[in-house]
């Protein structure tokens, strides 16, 4: 049947289409485009049933033309309605395929799954970490119970929060080439053994022919081994030349148990040992006693040239070991996460403040400090300001600004004088404040003032919150009493001498008592031996023992009596000394406004006038 002819098939007229025109019509028909209804399934169904493009027209229907295809494309009829049209083929295979395609087309597309955030994605790569046992050097026995749980504390700190390690390109390259390098070095060792065996052939007591045969055999093996070495070298270069991501995120797994440290052999190669144990890094520690303080050093080792061993050191008292381990673990976590050094810039007010960073004083606050992310303790203090101590967290970023603003203490100008208006030096600790009467500026700080010279002193302190608001005030301190000071010194000396005499008398009484007990036991044994039948001859010295026992009894009684008397004497003098100390304790004084002082002065003068008149 030629193109353009009609035929009678299935009781209707069918207009055949040339294959070339069929391909054009498949492209032009909108059902075959991938943009129809936004589904690839519809396009596949339309392409699957491309014979349906040769639509069976009725006898009166005109032949399809390009204009009809263009109008059909403008209408965009759905593919499901086309498949369900009566003009579709009636073959059973096409009917089954038509039903399946209709089901595919009727199924709505699945909603797009939201992409998870990178922070919530669990990395596929694993970076395994182990903690070995710590070593102790020079730790006294009294402090060993403090340092024993150091490794357990570090293990707990590392297990608290999840860790992510970023594998750099250099680290990935070295880890990929590590097994090939091990094979390369193994081949080198095997070649060295073969060369050594070849050299020792000349020492064997064999014939020259056998020696040449053995040497040739070893030479052949050495050449084969050199070929293997060259292949291993090529494999190492190939592994290092591979493409790696600039940064690959890996999840850190802390292996082992709290009470089970990672066991290390006596001699080992770190990179090979870690690869055999399927580990990525190893943490070791060392604790050293330094003049009563403990110095803790942690080492993070990977065995790779791209990742050198990093050391973290901190020192402090033994009782602060948990705090030290907490700080070191924070620094270790930052190193595990491949944190870059942080440049810390200080912005401290007042400028003359003293700042210590993790217990280490910072000499120049105008210069930046280089540190690593983690938790640190900062202490700031300045004269005339409230001190501040705070734990800060430095994030993983290039620069960190530490801004500190100390709160100034309230300053008050007061006039200092004594109750009897006499002149006496005033000391605050070892610092001389002035000689009364004088004016000075004091802060709302509870400090003890010493009034008077060394021979006659009194003590006082200012109660907090007692300064008049924005008013000039006068601080009246108690005048020194020479008699009270001398009496206090005398009672102190007497109490010290009483205690010294008691310390001498008590050991003497104890020694005499023990000697008396030994003498009584010896005398009893001698009497028991003399009372046994038949009576043996009386041992010599029994009378001497009795006289010695009597003398010791008298001496012990006297010593015990003296010790009791001295004990009572010490108790009495200690009580008198404590009573004098209580009377000479620092007195609380309150600053008074100048108008109150003037009123009191006028009142005292009026009372004196009344007394004179009377």
From Swiss-Prot:
Superkingdom, natural source: Bacteria
Cell membrane keyword on record: yes
Stretches assigned to coiled coil: none
Biased composition (Basic and acidic residues): 591-605
Sorted UniProt keywords: Cell membrane, Membrane, Transmembrane, Transmembrane helix
One GO term describing the cellular component: plasma membrane
Recorded topology in the membrane: Multi-pass membrane protein
Transmembrane annotation, as ranges: 494-516, 552-574
Region listing for Disordered, in residue ranges: 588-614
Localization per Swiss-Prot or TrEMBL: Cell membrane
Signal peptide as annotated in the record: none
Listed name of the protein: Uncharacterized protein TP_0577
Origin species: Treponema pallidum (strain Nichols)
């Amino acid at each position: 049947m030629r193109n353009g002819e009609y035929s009678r098939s299935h009781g209707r007229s069918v207009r055949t289409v040339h294959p070339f025109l069929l391909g054009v019509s498949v492209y032009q028909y909108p059902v075959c485009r991938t943009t129809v209804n936004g589904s690839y399934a519809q396009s596949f169904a339309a392409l699957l049933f491309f014979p349906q493009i040769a639509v069976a027209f009725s006898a009166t229907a005109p032949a399809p033309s390009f204009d009809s295809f263009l109008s059909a494309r403008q209408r965009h009829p759905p593919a499901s309605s086309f498949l369900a049209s009566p003009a579709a083929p009636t073959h059973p295979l096409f009917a089954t395929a038509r039903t399946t395609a209709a089901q595919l087309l009727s199924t709505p597309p699945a909603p797009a799954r939201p992409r998870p955030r990178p922070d919530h994605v669990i990395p596929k790569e694993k970076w395994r970490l182990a903690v070995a046992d710590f070593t102790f050097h020079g730790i006294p026995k009294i402090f060993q119970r403090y340092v024993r749980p150091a490794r357990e504390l570090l293990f707990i700190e590392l297990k608290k929060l999840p860790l992510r390690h970023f594998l750099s390109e250099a680290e990935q390259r070295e880890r990929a080439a590590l097994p090939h390098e091990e094979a390369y070095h193994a081949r080198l060792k095997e070649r060295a053994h073969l060369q050594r065996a070849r050299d020792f052939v000349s020492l064997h007591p064999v014939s020259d022919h056998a020696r040449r045969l053995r040497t040739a055999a070893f030479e052949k093996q050495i050449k084969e081994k050199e070929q293997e070495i060259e292949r291993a070298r090529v494999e190492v270069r190939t592994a290092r030349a591979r493409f790696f991501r600039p940064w690959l995120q890996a999840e850190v797994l802390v292996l082992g148990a709290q009470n089970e440290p990672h066991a290390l052999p006596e001699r080992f190669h770190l990179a090979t040992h870690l690869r055999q144990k399927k580990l990525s890094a190893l943490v070791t520690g060392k604790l050293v006693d330094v003049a009563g303080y403990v110095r803790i050093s942690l080492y993070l080792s990977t065995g790779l040239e791209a990742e050198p061993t990093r050391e973290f050191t901190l020192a402090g008292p033994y009782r602060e070991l948990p705090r030290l381990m907490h700080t070191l673990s924070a620094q270790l976590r930052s190193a595990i996460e491949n944190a870059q050094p942080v440049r810390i810039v200080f912005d401290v007010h007042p400028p003359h403040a003293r700042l210590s960073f993790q217990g280490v004083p910072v000499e120049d606050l105008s210069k930046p400090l280089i540190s690593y992310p983690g938790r640190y303790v900062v202490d700031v203090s300045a004269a005339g300001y409230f001190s501040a101590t705070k734990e800060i967290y430095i994030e993983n970023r290039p620069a960190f600004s530490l801004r500190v603003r100390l709160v100034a203490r309230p300053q008050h100008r007061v006039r200092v004088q004594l109750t009897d208006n006499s002149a006496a030096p005033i000391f605050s600790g070892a610092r001389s404040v002035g000689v009364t009467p004088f004016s000075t500026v004091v802060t709302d700080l509870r400090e003890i003032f010493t009034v008077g010279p060394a021979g006659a002193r009194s003590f006082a302190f200012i109660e907090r919150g007692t300064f008049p608001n924005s008013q000039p005030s006068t601080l009246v301190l108690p005048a020194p009493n020479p008699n009270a000071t001398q009496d206090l010194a005398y009672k102190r000396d007497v109490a010290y001498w009483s205690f010294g005499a008691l310390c001498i008398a008590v050991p003497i009484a104890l020694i005499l008592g023990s000697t008396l007990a030994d003498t009584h036991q010896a005398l009893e044994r001698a009497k028991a031996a003399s009372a046994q039948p038949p009576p043996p001859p009386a041992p010599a010295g029994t009378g001497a023992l009795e006289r010695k026992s009597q003398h010791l009894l008298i001496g012990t009684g006297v010593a015990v009596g003296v010790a009791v008397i001295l004990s009572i004497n010490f108790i009495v003098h200690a009580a008198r000394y404590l009573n004098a100390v209580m009377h000479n304790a620092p007195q609380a004084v309150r600053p008074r406004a100048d108008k109150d002082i003037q009123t009191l002065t006028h009142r005292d003068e009026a009372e004196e006038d009344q007394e004179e008149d009377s």
